[in-house]
């Protein structure tokens, strides 16, 4: 139902983004040429007919032909998806690996200069727009110091139908700046969340009991407090992974990263309705699957949910 609703709304909105026939033929085309091309593309049918046709094809994994490139939309997305997924996963790993330790430090050293500095920097991280962060990183590392490339994906290796830059040094170099740019907001968010949850957990009675038993601070902090702190972090991180994939558009545009986001921007400029609709449907599907995975993981991590019995149970 969610997918059908997203498909309907996106398909309806995209009817008003522009006329692909004008983009294909130009302003000097005759009315007869416009009518013929509109019929060839199936745009002469009514909206309900076009939508039903789109849904029927989408169920089979086909989204029609790109009006701009004349190729199957499914093939275009299959080419671009690996780049977006690698960028999003890299950004998520950076956000987790850096954000969680910094959040724990900020909680355990609350009031210290280092903690206050981290909170100030994290506030900038959630406030600055992504494109500005990307431009600043390009200015520093690509223009001034010339140590990292500023655009493109670099050299890739084909593993069947999947292309990856993880297996080449050039691919890693090209990945650094866009991945860091995309991770900044998530990193700051995770750090602030971990700090807030850690401070709340440290005030819990079972933490006081653990200290009263004489457990060392390391066991209290990392064996008890951090474990319970990570439960809500898992939920937020899972949901944010979907956001990383969806909102990688800006980062991919700044760095000309050949992913789905850049494909979507190019489709908007050309009023390529099949590509735009397919992109939004795929993003919606990713969100649905991630939400399902997060719910299952949350159930596996939090023992309280496994111990709960249904009402009326014995």
Q: Language-model features: where?
A:
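Hydrophobic alpha-helical transmembrane segments of membrane transport/permease proteins
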Residues: 2-52, 145-167
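Alpha-helical transmembrane segments of integral membrane proteins
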Residues: 4, 81-114, 143, 158-314
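Membrane-water interface segments at the C-terminal ends of transmembrane alpha-helices
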Residues: 9-17, 45, 56, 121-152, ...
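Alpha-helical transmembrane segments and their helix-entry boundary regions
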Residues: 23, 46, 76, 115, ...
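Hydrophobic alpha-helical transmembrane segments
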Residues: 27-42, 119-133, 177-183, 219-236
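Short hydrophobic, aromatic-rich alpha-helical segments embedded in or entering the lipid bilayer
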Residues: 30-62, 207, 256-267
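An internal, D/E-rich "acidic patch" concept
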Residues: 44-100
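Amphipathic alpha-helical recognition patches that constitute DNA-binding helices
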Residues: 46, 50, 54, 72, ...
């Amino acid at each position: 139902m969610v997918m059908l609703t997203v498909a309907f709304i996106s398909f309806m909105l995209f009817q008003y983004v522009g006329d692909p026939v004008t983009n294909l033929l130009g302003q000097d085309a005759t009315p007869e040429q416009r009518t013929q091309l509109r019929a060839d593309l199936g745009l002469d049918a009514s909206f309900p007919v076009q939508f039903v046709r789109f849904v029927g094809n989408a169920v089979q994994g086909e989204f029609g032909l790109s009006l701009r490139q004349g190729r199957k939309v499914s093939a275009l997305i299959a080419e671009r998806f690996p780049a977006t997924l690698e960028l999003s996963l890299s950004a998520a790993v950076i956000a987790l690996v850096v954000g969680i330790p910094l959040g724990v430090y900020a909680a355990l050293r609350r009031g210290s200069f280092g903690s206050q500095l981290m909170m100030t920097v994290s506030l900038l991280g959630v406030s600055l727009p992504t494109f500005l962060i990307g431009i600043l990183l390009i200015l520093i590392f690509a223009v001034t110091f010339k140590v990292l490339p500023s655009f493109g994906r670099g050299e890739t290796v084909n593993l069947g139908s999947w292309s990856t830059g993880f297996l080449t040094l050039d691919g890693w170099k090209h990945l650094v700046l866009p991945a860091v740019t995309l991770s900044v907001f998530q990193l700051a968010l995770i750090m602030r969340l971990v700090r807030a949850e850690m401070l709340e957990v440290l005030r819990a009675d079972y933490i006081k009991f653990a200290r009263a038993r004489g457990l060392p601070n390391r066991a209290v902090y990392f064996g008890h407090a951090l474990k319970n702190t990570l439960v809500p972090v898992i939920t937020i991180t899972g949901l944010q992974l979907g956001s990383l994939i969806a909102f990688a558009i800006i980062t991919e545009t700044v760095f000309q990263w050949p992913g789905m986001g850049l494909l979507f921007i190019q489709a908007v400029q050309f009023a390529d309705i099949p590509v735009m609709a397919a992109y939004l449907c795929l993003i919606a599907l990713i969100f649905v699957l991630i939400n399902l995975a997060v719910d299952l993981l949350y159930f596996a991590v939090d023992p309280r949910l496994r111990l709960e019995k249904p009402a009326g149970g014995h």
